[in-house]
Amino acid sequence: MDESHTIWIEKYRPAKLADIVGQDDIVERLSSYVKSGNLPHLLFTGSAGVGKTTAAVTLAREFFGDSWQMNFRELNASDERGIDVVRNQIKEFARTRPAGDAAFKILFLDEADALTTDAQAALRRTMESYAKTCRFILSCNYSSKIIDPIQSRCAIYRFRPLGPQAVKEEITRIAAREHLDVTPEAMDAMVYIAQGDMRKAINALQGAAILSATIEAPMVYAITSNARPEEIGELLTLSLSGDFDGAEALLTRLLRERGIAPNELINQCYRALTKRDMDRVLKVELIDALGETDFRLSEGASSDIQMEALIARFVLAGTRKR
């Protein structure tokens, strides 16, 4: 395949455990399994884009070498949430003997928290029955959604969101390989958008690179449909100063002209509020309003009405505090 058409998150996916950035403690502990030649069942938990899938794939590569693809299988539980996927695909893979001289195989089940409770119970029985021939690596965003009998059978690894420095180092490395010039402001924009998710940062870089070899902040915000932090600050200032018309005009521009998703705008407002120096009681009231609006949107309420109502609540709250 022409590398110019390759998705960068795959092109630059680490091939070794040691190449994974921002998860040094986890990498060290996983490497110790490779040295020992043995592996327990594992549960990887953490938000998206922090290296869970990469850790599973590189671990299999280092355990099995050239035969890793024959002894490793990846399934996504969100595709098939029911018990049939456990009875059929998972059990069929787990029961067969490993290829070559491998002592066991590895089955990586991504988004395991999407499995129903009954499916998880069946999975637990499968993990017990075929522990000699297959090790399971489960990945999830929320470990609380994994039943206790599975958690107790796994070594649990909590992947934290990647820090700004880790994101910057990876973006700098990729930019050098792709002959891109990334301005400091654009780098800060990608860190802001990523929120610890390396996939988001790399996708933003690739999207911007299609437009120009010189990456600047405005194009990063534009292609990712994010408001600039200063725009969010202006929206809050207008609302809290009582300027409903000004806040409404800016809200309309962000949602309709720029195409920013309402839930993304709520997330950006929340991030700005948590860092804003302001009356604590007022901050609590505003965050409560954000949470209620986010919930109503998730329930299918009209986004136009809910976002207008949110601005109205901000204006009223700011007016009461003046």
From Swiss-Prot:
The keyword ATP-binding applies. The keyword Nucleotide-binding applies. GO terms for biological process: DNA repair; DNA-templated DNA replication. One of its GO terms (molecular function) is DNA binding. ATP binds at G46, S47, A48, G49, V50, G51, K52, T53. One of its GO terms (cellular component) is DNA replication factor C complex. CDD domains: AAA (cd00009), HLD_clamp_RFC (cd18140). Disulfide bonds: none annotated. It holds the Pfam family AAA_lid_RFC1. Keywords: ATP-binding, DNA replication, Nucleotide-binding. Belongs to the activator 1 small subunits family. RfcS subfamily. Heteromultimer composed of small subunits (RfcS) and large subunits (RfcL). Part of the RFC clamp loader complex which loads the PCNA sliding clamp onto DNA. This is Replication factor C small subunit. It comes from Methanoregula boonei (strain DSM 21154 / JCM 14090 / 6A8). The lineage of its organism: Archaea, Methanobacteriati, Methanobacteriota, Stenosarchaea group, Methanomicrobia. The gene is rfcS.
